């Protein structure tokens, strides 16, 4: 764990923020490169990326407030720390809605654009999870496996206990998913296939990793909030993947 990477002219550069920024930069560069090959205007793509990022930030914060509303009501000062509290599924949903609205404004094919965007999203998530590891948040359950990691003086993870490095599991998974989507996008013939595979595969992976998470978070019955949302995203993904078949029926 390394919450503060280094200091520059007295300014602390935090690992979590640095990885988020690096992930966004990598995602935008990848999106710009791929969109040019498909004839999209660079300025329009950049504007859409900004709108999507803003929507993602707002969505991530909003879902955090919804999930942790009881604790926030008891301790409203939590909201004063703008860097605290963020739910990735809220960011995905908020970003997707923003991209959808922008596509409608530009009369773009929504599914084609989502196909173009999701590899960049997965790439950004991979960097973001490294940031989680550096900060010590989103930690795993105790483990006796050699792969277990120990945090010291973390404001989030318990100290001096070997824990599953769920942040690293998620990061590796996200990077592999990004590369798979890039590969599949070259052979996908129908709009929506890349996007649908993203929400299906990410949903399945998230359900699995959540079983290893040890940090406190919201739940719906026996499932964590993210597992509950994942069930719906998987269903949506399956529907979109087979949308042509449903239309014919």
From Swiss-Prot:
Superkingdom of this protein's organism: Bacteria
Pathway terms, separated by semicolons: Protein modification; lipoprotein biosynthesis (diacylglyceryl transfer)
Record carries keyword Transmembrane helix: yes
UniProt keyword annotations, A-Z: Cell membrane, Membrane, Transferase, Transmembrane, Transmembrane helix
Coiled-coil regions listed: none
Signal peptide feature range: none
Residues that hold a 1,2-diacyl-sn-glycero-3-phospho-(1'-sn-glycerol) according to the record: 129
NCBIfam families in the cross-refs: lgt, PRK00052.3-4
Name recorded for this polypeptide: Phosphatidylglycerol--prolipoprotein diacylglyceryl transferase
Organism: Clostridium tetani (strain Massachusetts / E88)
Gene this chain is encoded by: lgt
